Amino acid sequence: MKVQQYRLDELAHLVKGELIGEGSLQFSNLASLENAEVNHLTFVNGEKHLDQAKVSRAGAYIVTAALKEHLPEKDNFIIVDNPYLAFAILTHVFDKKISSTGIESTAQIHPSAVISKTAYIGHYVVIGENCVVGDNTVIQSHTKLDDNVEVGKDCFIDSHVTITGGSKLRDRVRIHSSTVIGGEGFGFAPYQGKWHRIAQLGSVLIGNDVRIGSNCSIDRGALDNTILEDGVIIDNLVQIAHNVHIGSNTAIAAKCGIAGSTKIGKNCILAGACGVAGHLSIADNVTLTGMSMVTKNISEAGTYSSGTGLFENNHWKKTIVRLRQLADVPLTQITKRLDHIQAQIESLESTFNLRK
């Protein structure tokens, strides 16, 4: 198969960059500084990468004007304010796109479902009663859309995804393999030593430009809906419980778990393996560092941490012993000791000042 080539001046135009060098050069792909060849375009994202750039074999470089001055031995550049953003834009140029439309013969679609003529429905897809699939949406093989599910325009639903509970997806949503949207929330009423299942009657609403990774679970609401606003991005292996509300442009990394009825604000970042207890509220513009555990409301923007960083093993054991010893000492006793030490310091300072 012939590889698509792009001229350097075409690529510069796409990112609104300034071309320096030979615009007619042809490029077949993007590549890292380390592995780029003469037919590859690469980018330099900061001064720390300049040493790599100087020895790279790439045919052209996406850089800022300031970074270019450090590469006098190179000839071909695209000058932009943000090289990483330009790189992100150009990845879509070189990405292999699914251009098929229509419905594969093995798909099972209920007669009441409304499927756009420009959509693609892959092999062994099952689409239930009263479903809607919008223009240019791709649904890969072995995916199931249960009754009353709606998927908007320009969406991509990868293989083995299940969307149920009457979930509604807006436009340009991407969902990757083996994720479940709208599954039953974890709701049970305890009575007389038994757990009594609560039927989940809400749904899941997903906004525009949302990206959800593989092997995620986003549960339908118990009564109200679980909501992901526009621009939310979610990594693999994330659990979002029933009635959670996630604000626009929030990013959630792998292995995070968010318990039920919690509301997370806009433009937040949850780093890997964070846990958020239920029925809490987190303000806009909050960052949680890796392995943080949120057990109370966060009302102000900022960066918060609770995960313990790595220790050498023997150091860790000694630290744990000290923590246990500290826990055995009453807080009032510690406070009295600190007050006594403070009084001694003040007495010494007073004596020293008098002798002056």
UniProtKB/Swiss-Prot annotation:
Disulfide bonds, paired cysteine numbers: none
Metabolic or biological pathway: Bacterial outer membrane biogenesis; LPS lipid A biosynthesis
Keywords carried by this UniProt record: Acyltransferase, Lipid A biosynthesis, Lipid biosynthesis, Lipid metabolism, Repeat, Transferase
Domain of life: Bacteria
Pfam families per the UniProt record, alphabetical: Hexapep, LpxD
EC number in record: 2.3.1.191
InterPro entries the UniProt entry points to: Hexapep, LpxD, Trimer_LpxA-like_sf, UDP_GlcNAc_AcTrfase_non-rep
Gene3D superfamilies given in the database record: 1.20.5.170, Hexapeptide repeat proteins (2.160.10.10), MurE/MurF, N-terminal domain (3.40.1390.10)
GO biological process: one example: lipid A biosynthetic process
Range of residues in the leader sequence: none
Record's keyword annotation contains Lipid biosynthesis: yes
One GO cellular component term: membrane
GO molecular function, one term: N-acyltransferase activity
Reactions the enzyme catalyzes: a UDP-3-O-[(3R)-3-hydroxyacyl]-alpha-D-glucosamine + a (3R)-hydroxyacyl-[ACP] = a UDP-2-N,3-O-bis[(3R)-3-hydroxyacyl]-alpha-D-glucosamine + holo-[ACP] + H(+)
Active site annotation, chain numbering: H242
Function: Catalyzes the N-acylation of UDP-3-O-acylglucosamine using 3-hydroxyacyl-ACP as the acyl donor. Is involved in the biosynthesis of lipid A, a phosphorylated glycolipid that anchors the lipopolysaccharide to the outer membrane of the cell.
Quaternary organization: Homotrimer.
Protein family membership: Belongs to the transferase hexapeptide repeat family. LpxD subfamily.
Descriptive protein name: UDP-3-O-acylglucosamine N-acyltransferase
Organism from which the protein derives: Acinetobacter baumannii (strain ACICU)
Species classification: Bacteria, Pseudomonadati, Pseudomonadota, Gammaproteobacteria, Moraxellales
Gene behind the chain: lpxD
